[in-house]
Amino acid sequence: MSNTGTTGRVPLWFVGMIVGLAALGLLGIFFYGSYTGLGSSL
């Protein structure tokens, strides 16, 4: 894997993927908690 212009740095698509997965994970945990009653107090 050779990404041009991203030597010594993390590729932008990789950062975007990690941020996207983290956001989806947090939303999933929040909605799951609200449905099960754990996050209803938030």
Swiss-Prot record:
UniProt keyword annotations, A-Z: Chloroplast, Membrane, Photosynthesis, Photosystem II, Plastid, Reaction center, Thylakoid, Transmembrane, Transmembrane helix
Keyword Cytoplasm: no
Any single Pfam family the record assigns to this protein: PsbJ
UniProt entry tagged with the keyword Transmembrane helix: yes
One cellular component (GO) term of this entry: chloroplast thylakoid membrane
Membrane topology: Single-pass membrane protein
Highest taxon of the lineage: Eukaryota
GO biological process terms, semicolon-separated: photosynthesis
Transmembrane segments: 12-32
Main location per the UniProt record: plastid
Subcellular compartments: Plastid, Chloroplast thylakoid membrane
Family from the record: Belongs to the PsbJ family.
Its job: One of the components of the core complex of photosystem II (PSII). PSII is a light-driven water:plastoquinone oxidoreductase that uses light energy to abstract electrons from H(2)O, generating O(2) and a proton gradient subsequently used for ATP formation. It consists of a core antenna complex that captures photons, and an electron transfer chain that converts photonic excitation into a charge separation.
Known partners and oligomeric status: PSII is composed of 1 copy each of membrane proteins PsbA, PsbB, PsbC, PsbD, PsbE, PsbF, PsbH, PsbI, PsbJ, PsbK, PsbL, PsbM, PsbT, PsbX, PsbY, PsbZ, Psb30/Ycf12, at least 3 peripheral proteins of the oxygen-evolving complex and a large number of cofactors. It forms dimeric complexes.
Name this polypeptide is given: Photosystem II reaction center protein J
Biological source species: Nephroselmis olivacea
Organism ancestry: Eukaryota, Viridiplantae, Chlorophyta, Nephroselmidophyceae, Nephroselmidales
Protein encoded by which gene: psbJ
